[in-house]
Amino acid sequence: PGYPDLVGFGRRDMTVSPEEAAADLAYQVGALWAIARAEGVTLRHVKPHGALYNRAARDRALALALAHAVRALDLGLVLVGLAGSAMEQAAREAGIALAGEAFADRAYNSDGSLVSRSRPGSVIEDVATVARRAVSIARDGSVETYDGGRINLAAHTICVHGDTEQAAQIARAVREAVVAAGIRPEPLWKIV
């Protein structure tokens, strides 16, 4: 679920109250749940998208509203949010499971936030670099920052974006590198 921003693919920040965002999340997840059920599959997790995700990572009121909306749906869904962000505390307060997420293909600021996509180097597209970062996140719980430092990340899941030119190759390389490092990928609902 994300902001109602079709033209900007949900990546533009919008002025929406926490209550409106929670209602949008409930509507979007409810629709997706119905589609999944009609197709005979089970919806297991929910992840806010784009600007909504980024705002919820730093806006406690929004994070809490989204977490309560997920809880109110009563579908047993795992909420996915940026590791170390306001989403973690919000999920705890709402009494729902949260999968802390890290990004192997995005640059981090030293405070754990993602570097704005408007900055050069914010999206990492080199296959080997992304795979190496994924292993560092999964095995060591840390990643290099935009300014060359390191931050710790307690992540349950690693995201790679599907809209980069080599997305499929990156995803394969990440899985192969993580498995080669002795880490066995598991479904979120089994580990959170």
Question: Residue ranges of each PLM-predicted region?
Answer:
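Glycine-rich tight-turn/loop motif centered on a GG-T
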Residues: 7-22, 75, 113-125
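Catalytic beta/alpha-barrel core
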Residues: 21, 55-58, 73-83
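Flexible, glycine/charged-enriched surface loops at secondary-structure junctions
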Residues: 36-44, 142-152, 182-191
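Structural preference for beta-strand elements that scaffold enzyme active sites
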Residues: 43-47, 76-80, 97-99, 157-159, ...
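Charged helix-capping and loop-helix junction motifs
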Residues: 59-65
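Glycine/small-residue-rich loop that forms an oxyanion/phosphate-binding "nest" at active or ligand-binding sites
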Residues: 5-48, 55
